[in-house]
Regions:
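Long, contiguous binding/interaction regions
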Residues: 1-162
Length: 162
């Protein structure tokens, strides 16, 4: 059983049909395979192929997806992936003309980050206190996942009374 990585994704594309295609694929739970399918020749080697080409072993477990009503060339989605964010897939989406902005947080292995069109701003949170995390990561990343708030709560619940 994997640790789950929380992901927040914003996609934009000049062709609104590509945004609709992404929306529909996310809604079906087939986003990765829609844009970067596992080749038939790799079906027996799916695990290696998926981790190499998507950055994770399974499709996204989507919890929300919507197209911006005011700007139909923009889509926002939230989903979980096994172990890590699908950064390799994001790189592929860029080659298809998408602008990709993503945030991710994996609480089990204590890392988080923000990815924007090829730049990964990665933060190793292992061994840091909630206060250190709050002062280390960008506010928008912390707010997206409630990282420091959850850590403060955990610290409070696990601090022995003196």
């Amino acid at each position: 059983m994997p640790n789950w990585c929380n992901n927040s994704l914003t996609l934009s594309h000049e062709d609104e049909k590509m945004i609709v295609r992404a929306h529909d694929a996310l809604a079906r739970g087939e986003f990765f395979t829609e844009f970067l399918p596992v080749p038939e020749a790799e079906k027996d080697n799916w695990y290696f192929w998926c981790t190499t080409n998507w950055g994770t072993k399974w499709e996204a477990n989507v919890s929300g997806v919507e197209i911006d009503r005011d700007e139909p060339s923009i889509l926002e989605a939230s989903f979980d992936t096994a172990w890590s964010p699908p950064i390799e897939l994001y790189k592929h989406l860029q080659t298809l003309g998408f602008t990709v902005e993503a945030k991710y947080y994996e609480s089990g292995m204590c890392f988080a980050g923000m990815w924007y069109n090829g730049y990964d701003d990665f933060f190793d949170l292992g061994g840091l206190s909630a206060e250190e995390v709050e002062h280390t990561i960008p506010e928008e990343l912390d707010a997206e996942f409630g990282i420091s708030d959850n850590m403060y709560q955990w610290e409070e619940e696990n601090t022995e009374d003196s």
